[in-house]
Regions:
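Glycine-rich, flexible loop motifs
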Residues: 2-51, 81-134, 228, 243
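Conserved, non-catalytic sequence blocks in retroelement Pol enzymes and Pol-derived host proteins
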Residues: 113, 142-144, 374
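Short, low-complexity, polar/charged sequence segments that are solvent-exposed and flexible
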Residues: 73-76, 120, 213-215
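Hydrophobic alpha-helical context, especially transmembrane and signal-peptide helices
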Residues: 49-53, 131-137, 151, 172, ...
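Cysteine-centered functional microenvironments
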Residues: 136-141, 318-322
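C-terminal auxiliary extensions adjacent to catalytic cores
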Residues: 2-24, 28-35, 39-42, 47, ...
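FAD-binding core of FAD-dependent oxidoreductases
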Residues: 55-69, 73-77, 84-109, 137-159, ...
Length: 495
């Protein structure tokens, strides 16, 4: 199928999920094509008639903004910009993020406010549709002036430079372009700056983090419900009336989800000896709910961002204006990444506490969830693993957005550090997925000690699928294998 990049309607996270899942081919709408061409024509005419320097178009960049560049060197200026700014370091950015970077850069340029050539946007679409993913590096962006270094690496293949991942192999971009019958592009005035100035590195991470976070929010409720039954917990804390009198949206959603997940559970319905449960069970709606509300806020920030123009300077043909502003500054994203990381990390923190309770030898469960504790260590050490991951997340949740380091001789004297916030948040979310997998392994084991009583039909169906991969553990075995298998089950679980 094809997906039309259109400026007449917003693109949502749901749209992006559909594009990714359906492996859609991108095309530009007629209106987007007209906008791009009209903006470029306006700039060409403006350059021919105006002698006053325009930042980034016929001047240097950053603190070199007062250096005027002669007309016969403008194309070289743009090529030099891309080459000189491609100085990333560290690990290669995951291909799933690079794919999103291409998509979001195309989306931003389609508004016709950046004065790029139509063929430049077409070539970005060619890269996306042919699954030619530029090699980009994690380190190098300050999250202001756009994601300069990552976007420079993203743009190098347009010039026949740099490296790409194509068909699973790391190749020279020039070789792949030739193989596909594509010629390198010669950048015209302003184009290099339009390609590099933008927040698409941060935004791509944001889209990925939110798509994953939405799933983790649902998973946490489902796995938390399994743990509640495994722990022989009470149902009263999830009744609707207690949440209606404190009606935070996420709290209400979570309580409803727990009730639905446990509907029909024989374990939940049996008489209880204990008067109340620990907070990690009793307060699931309040804790998980707060994370849902935080995720919803961050979602609104990024849906605004991916439907924005974050180039500089910005070209307004209809107003006969070229404005040097600051839409490239990533502060809204940096703060949101820090917020999301903290919120999602709490799903992992409370999950580890439930694991600790399950292995503690209370509620008629054997110590460490194994029939012969002592001879067997059982589920003792997976909790250690969970604790180490929770601790790492606490370190990763130190805010990046409160930091700023002056750059470019003081011209760029405040930066967001949003790119660092993005890569940290990505790691936190990966860690929480592991923590929920550890909880599922423990909770499924605990449920077996409640037999012959059954949990809810929904949970029993899930556990039946789970047991096809990971059987009940009677005696000690290499737990790494069980943990990895559980993680893959969680990653591929369709909920």
């Amino acid at each position: 199928m094809t997906f039309s990049i259109s400026t007449d309607k917003i693109i949502t996270l749901k749209d992006i999920q559909h594009i990714l899942d359906s492996n859609a081919t991108l095309v530009l709408s007629v209106k987007a094509k007209q906008n791009i061409i009209a903006c470029r024509e306006y700039l060409d005419k403006k350059m021919a008639s105006q002698k006053t320097p325009i930042y980034g178009i016929n001047t240097g960049f950053g603190s070199l903004c007062n250096v005027v560049i002669p007309d016969n060197e403008l194309e070289q200026l743009q090529t030099n910009l891309v080459m000189s700014h491609a100085c990333g370091m560290g690990n290669e950015v995951p291909l799933e993020i690079v794919r999103l970077m291409l998509l979001l850069k195309i989306q931003s340029l389609s508004y016709g406010k950046s004065a790029v050539q139509f063929q430049t946007v077409e070539r970005l679409i060619d890269l996306y549709n042919h699954k030619v993913y530029p090699i980009v590096y994690e380190q190098g962006s300050l999250g202001a002036s756009g994601d300069l270094s990552p976007l420079a690496h993203l743009s190098l293949p347009l010039l026949g430079m740099g490296e790409v991942n194509y068909q699973g192999n790391k190749c020279q971009a020039s070789v792949v372009l030739k193989q596909l019958g594509l010629e390198p592009i010669t950048l015209k005035s302003k184009e290099g700056l339009a390609l590099l100035n933008g927040t698409q590195f941060m935004s791509a991470y944001g889209v990925w983090c939110l798509l994953k976070s939405n799933k983790l929010n649902t998973l946490a409720d489902l796995i938390g419900a399994i743990s509640l039954d495994g722990f022989d917990g009470r149902s009263e804390p999830f009744k609707d009336n207690i949440h209606i009198i404190r009606p935070h949206k996420g709290q209400l959603q979570t309580a409803r989800a727990i009730r639905e997940n446990l509907a029909g559970s024989e374990i939940l319905a049996q008489a209880k000896v204990q008067v109340q449960d620990p907070y990690s069970f009793r307060c699931i709606p309040q804790v998980h709910g707060a994370t849902k509300d935080a995720t919803a806020y961050v979602n609104s920030v990024f849906e605004t961002e991916i439907n924005s123009v974050t180039d500089n300077p910005t070209v307004f043909p209809e107003d006969d204006e070229i404005i040097s502003g600051g839409n490239f500054h990533g502060q809204p994203l940096a703060i949101s990444f820090d917020f999301l990381a903290i919120a999602i990390a709490e799903l992992g923190s409370i999950s580890e506490r439930r694991v600790y309770q399950l292995i503690s030898g209370t509620r008629n469960l054997p110590a460490f969830l194994v029939a012969k504790p002592g001879l067997n260590s059982g589920f003792m050490i997976p909790q250690y693993t969970a604790a180490s991951i929770v601790s790492q997340n606490k370190q990763l949740c130190t805010p990046a957005s409160i930091d700023s380091i002056v750059s470019s001789n003081g011209q760029e004297d405040h930066v967001s550090m949003g790119a660092n916030a993005a890569t940290k948040c990505y790691k936190v979310i990966e860690n929480v997925e592991k923590l929920l997998a550890i909880e599922l392994l423990n909770a499924s084991q605990a449920i077996e000690f409640r037999r012959p009583l059954k949990s809810s039909p929904k949970i029993e169906n899930l556990l039946a699928d789970f047991r096809k991969l990971i059987p009940f553990i009677k005696d000690d075995k290499i737990m790494y294998q069980e943990l990895e298998a559980t993680l893959q089950f969680v990653k591929t679980l369709n909920i």
